[in-house]
Amino acid sequence: MIELPALLATTITWMCRVAAVAASVNAIELLAMRHALFARGGWLPPPLAPQWGVWRLLLGARAFTGVLVAQIAFAAALAIAPGTTAGCIAAAVLAFITWLSALRFGGNVNGGSDAMLFTALGGLAVGQLPSVDSVVHEAGVLYVAAQLTLSYGRAGIVKARERSWWSGHALSAFLALPAYGVPTGLPRHMPNHRLLLRSASVGVIAFECLSPLAWLNPIACLVLIVLALGFHTAAAAVFGLNRFLLAWSAALPSLWYAVHRVA
């Protein structure tokens, strides 16, 4: 019999540590890219900068570099002090910085992965609030689990409605896009393996559409978590989507708590 209070504490600890890694990697990547972005004008304030309002004080070229350094520092605090008031503050600040980054770049260097990381960090901020009932902490974790499940379910439904996904053509098209940095050997050989592409596409659709079943049984939940980690690891290796791997990995422990909470 699993004790829910202990499981909740363990879940929050693991979510904090993985979310801290995700936030650190995001900041380090942007810092490493800033010279290349600056050369192309991407690091300078865009024409829509006046719409930033008061936040423009934090989003200028020099100021935002300091924000990213602060992101690494708060990520370290989140990893060191999970489940504490300091962890709560760190998660809240990191969620705010993630929002600032989305505002700063408007989706050009961030997207769904930052949205999931924002969700995980927001849930962790609630899950670590001091001097509140444990129900509030549970609500933060369960919210992340619900959003995680919805992200898979909605993606699966969208794919299931497209004939190109069932045939494997959509996956083949993604492999051929140069923007993802797909290993050079794959685009040459994969389009010839229609059965493999179709099988992989159907497998992804089934995995995403059946994700809500993870709430019904711990074994089903464990299977989904393993499949999810495999799916995101493969996507990171093939498409370079390491941010997705880290962001969703930060949220996946919430699903393990959810299935034990509702069972």
Could you say what each language-model-derived stretch is?
Residues 1-263:
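Alpha-helical membrane-anchoring segments
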